[in-house]
Amino acid sequence: MLGYFESILPYTNGGKLPYWLLFISVVSIFNSVQTYQNINLTKRVYEKNPNQVSPLSARTFGTWTLITSIVRFYGAYYLQNKQIYELTQFTFAIAAWHFLSEWLYFGTCKLGKGLSGPLIVSSVSLVWMYLQKDFYVN
């Protein structure tokens, strides 16, 4: 059984970034699914102004999350491809921009549990990918 799981994991070239991207991709799929079932977790992210979160906006957020999880999944397996690498990196840049602008400009988020996770994941991933590009891209 362990051999099967090892056979489907991405090639890492000795690094950990592909595993991280795969993990974040899978977690994002679950986050996306929950936005279609209940808007309460989405309201936690935008907790400074949760009345702006509607079922439609939550589903749109979930769809956006699903699209980025697919890109990140491909990124986990094809980091040696410059275009895939950069596209994956852009998903984190856009996520960081979105959450920072919602917090600092639009005022729908506040620094707390709901915002900390997305901010940490997007910013750490973005910096990690910036620093490791030459290691992975052929």
Swiss-Prot record:
Superkingdom of source: Eukaryota
UniProt keyword Transmembrane, yes or no: yes
Sugar attachment sites: N40
Main subcellular location of this protein, as a coarse class: endoplasmic reticulum
One GO BP: sterol biosynthetic process
Recorded GO MF terms: protein-macromolecule adaptor activity
Family per record: Belongs to the ERG28 family.
Protein known as: Ergosterol biosynthetic protein 28
Transmembrane feature ranges: 17-33, 56-75, 87-107, 114-131
Cell compartment(s), UniProt: Endoplasmic reticulum membrane
A Pfam entry, by short name: Erg28
GO cellular component, one term: endoplasmic reticulum
Matching PANTHER family: ERGOSTEROL BIOSYNTHETIC PROTEIN 28 HOMOLOG, ERGOSTEROL BIOSYNTHETIC PROTEIN 28-RELATED
Membrane topology per record: Multi-pass membrane protein
Complex formation: Heterotetramer of ERG25, ERG26, ERG27 and ERG28. ERG28 acts as a scaffold to tether ERG27 and other 4,4-demethylation-related enzymes, forming a demethylation enzyme complex, in the endoplasmic reticulum. Interacts with ERG25, ERG26 and ERG27. Also interacts with ERG1, ERG3, ERG5, ERG6 and ERG11.
Protein source organism: Candida albicans (strain SC5314 / ATCC MYA-2876)
Protein function: Part of the third module of ergosterol biosynthesis pathway that includes the late steps of the pathway. The third module or late pathway involves the ergosterol synthesis itself through consecutive reactions that mainly occur in the endoplasmic reticulum (ER) membrane. Firstly, the squalene synthase ERG9 catalyzes the condensation of 2 farnesyl pyrophosphate moieties to form squalene, which is the precursor of all steroids.
Keyword field: Endoplasmic reticulum, Glycoprotein, Lipid biosynthesis, Lipid metabolism, Membrane, Steroid biosynthesis, Steroid metabolism, Sterol biosynthesis, Sterol metabolism, Transmembrane, Transmembrane helix
